[in-house]
Amino acid sequence: MSNNNFKDDFEKNRQSINPDEQQTELKEDDKTNENKKEADSQNSLSNNSNQQFPPRNAQRRKRRRETATNQSKQQDDKHQKNSDAKTTEGSLDDRYDEAQLQQQHDKSQQQNKTEKQSQDNRMKDGKDAAIVNGTSESPEHKSKSTQNRPGPKAQQQKRKSESTQSKPSTNKDKKAATGAGIAGAAGVAGAAETSKRHHNKKDKQDSKHSNHENDEKSVKNDDQKQSKKGKKAAVGAGAAAGVGAAGVAHHNNQNKHHNEEKNSNQNNQYNDQSEGKKKGGFMKILLPLIAAILILGAIAIFGGMALNNHNDSKSDDQKIANQSKKDSDKKDGAQSEDNKDKKSDSNKDKKSDSDKNADDDSDNSSSNPNATSTNNNDNVANNNSNYTNQNQQDNANQNSNNQQATQGQQSHTVYGQENLYRIAIQYYGEGTQANVDKIKRANGLSSNNIHNGQTLVIPQ
């Protein structure tokens, strides 16, 4: 049985659609052999990716293997091209002997010492070194250009420059045998490369302004390329001194401009940091002031509340004291009224006792009417005569008493619910029974009952 028995009619009749085949065939004629291989692999991948109906089973596995091998080949080719380019660029790098490398190493160490001693003069020293030693060799210029970077960045650059300078020169003998014609051609090439470097350097400086974080990487790449190209220019200067000197001068001017741009960027960063510190310092001053104002406001509010509560408590205490005083006055008044009522009740009791005694006397007198009637009849005449005499004497005595009483007595008119005890307190200061009896005798009263509007005589 074949595999087609397991497929439906649609899968049996399917066909791959390759719309890019004609265009790729036209382009293949103009490419080289290497480009043809790459184009074939890419076309196979694109054709496989553009198929409307992807293959299954064995065909799919085959396509996966092809794509994997093509991708690995492409990566190997790219890596080989990059390595070839690096070897071609570095073919003219190492033209210095070991004595020159040692001198350069010593100079870089001295420059590191001076950099640690004076950080403020670092910028000026970098500019002066770029002007004076403009025609010197590129490794020296490379070590001086790194002086303009303060802090650990400059040290890292110098360490890398020392490591690049310490590489052994492998092709020194072969390069020393080259003639004057080759040197002249190299000089012309060095001048051309300095001009090319000028344009590349401007583009890199623009990218540095747009992105400060990639500044270190771009600076490292610039320094490496400058060192390589400076070495090429120095080789060409042996045959074409004029062209080489012009290229070196142009290179020094570009390095100077590059250092000034870096210094301006660093100054801008320092200014930004100082402005950030000023803003932070202002906020540090402002926040404690706001906190102190809030605390003082809270203290003032709580103090006012405490004073109000204190005043309220004082007023409440005063009200309570006044109320207690009024209550005590009411109690005293009630007690005095009770005492007066008790005294009046006792007087009433005494009066009732006296009335009882009078009744008893009247009873006793009525028990012997017959005995007394005879005596009365006998003494009627005597009594009449005595009565007349007594009336005369009583009138005389009463007149004399009235005259004496009117001379040192006062009168009082009864109003409201007054009684003899209150009147005695008003005139004598004490409501005793003796004072009440004095008023009763002066007014001829037999009881304590008095009525409203009655005029009483108050004796002295």
From Swiss-Prot:
Residues 410-458 form the LysM domain. It is a single-pass membrane protein. InterPro entries: LysM_dom (IPR018392), LysM_dom_sf (IPR036779). One of its GO terms (cellular component) is plasma membrane. Residues 1-277, 313-411 are annotated as: Disordered. The keyword Cell membrane applies. The chain crosses the membrane at residues 285-305. Keywords: Cell membrane, Membrane, Transmembrane, Transmembrane helix. It is found in: Cell membrane. Signal peptide: none annotated. Residues 1-14, 24-40, 74-128, 203-226, 313-359 have a biased composition (Basic and acidic residues). SUPFAM superfamilies: LysM domain. It comes from the Bacteria. Residues 41-57, 177-192, 264-273, 364-411 have a biased composition (Low complexity). SMART domains: LysM. PROSITE patterns: LYSM (PS51782). Its main location: membrane. This is Probable elastin-binding protein EbpS. It comes from Staphylococcus epidermidis (strain ATCC 12228 / FDA PCI 1200). The lineage of its organism: Bacteria, Bacillati, Bacillota, Bacilli, Bacillales. The gene is ebpS.
